[in-house]
């Protein structure tokens, strides 16, 4: 567990009062662990990793009262910082909780007809681990009535390929949303 704490203290000083209760010095570390890609079947998350780079996709159960309309949403970390973010949530009594955080548009996923996704459970179709990353394919066939959505992510070294597909017999307005933490640079 010490290596996890060392990673935490790369960005945060250990100056809280709680640090006095533990006399162990936990130095910051600059080395970034190389963890393998992993699938958390029970919670419906898949994590692709390549060196320090991480991509997380959420496809699983809705989560009841704590759930968000965010099937197939992703977050991306480049080893230094999060570059595609899942904003999480705020206190339940704050107006932004229902006006922003509980909206599909506040997540890095697909919005259909400017509406929120339905409470639904997605499905993992494939998960492949490679030494230099991996590949995941997940679907959310019930997030929007009549629309079958799937997302394929391929992480290979420092390159991420994101293929989002939405199929329907009817015409819809599709918004592909990425919550970026920085202004993108196009080359």
Task: Annotate each language-model stretch with its function.
Residues 1-84:
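Carbohydrate-active enzyme catalytic cores, enriched for enzymes
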Residues 1-9, 90-187:
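CBM-like, beta-strand-rich accessory domains located in the C-terminal region of large
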């Amino acid at each position: 567990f010490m290596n996890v704490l060392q990673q935490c203290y790369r960005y945060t000083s250990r100056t809280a009062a709680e640090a006095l209760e533990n006399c162990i010095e936990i130095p910051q570390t600059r080395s970034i662990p190389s963890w393998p890609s992993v699938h958390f079947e029970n919670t419906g998350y898949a994590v692709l990793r390549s060196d320090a780079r991480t991509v997380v996709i959420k496809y699983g159960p809705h989560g009841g009262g704590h759930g968000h309309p965010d099937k197939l949403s992703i977050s991306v970390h480049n080893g230094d910082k999060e570059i595609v973010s899942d904003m999480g949530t705020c206190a339940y009594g704050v107006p932004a909780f229902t006006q922003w955080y509980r909206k599909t548009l506040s997540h890095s996923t697909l919005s259909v007809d400017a509406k929120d996704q339905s409470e639904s459970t997605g499905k993992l179709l494939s998960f492949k681990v490679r030494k230099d990353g991996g590949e995941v394919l997940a679907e959310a066939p019930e997030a929007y009535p009549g629309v079958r959505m799937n997302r394929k992510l391929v992480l290979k070294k420092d390159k991420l390929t994101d293929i989002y597909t939405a199929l329907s017999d009817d015409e819809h307005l599709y918004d592909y949303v990425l919550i970026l933490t920085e202004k993108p640079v196009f080359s």
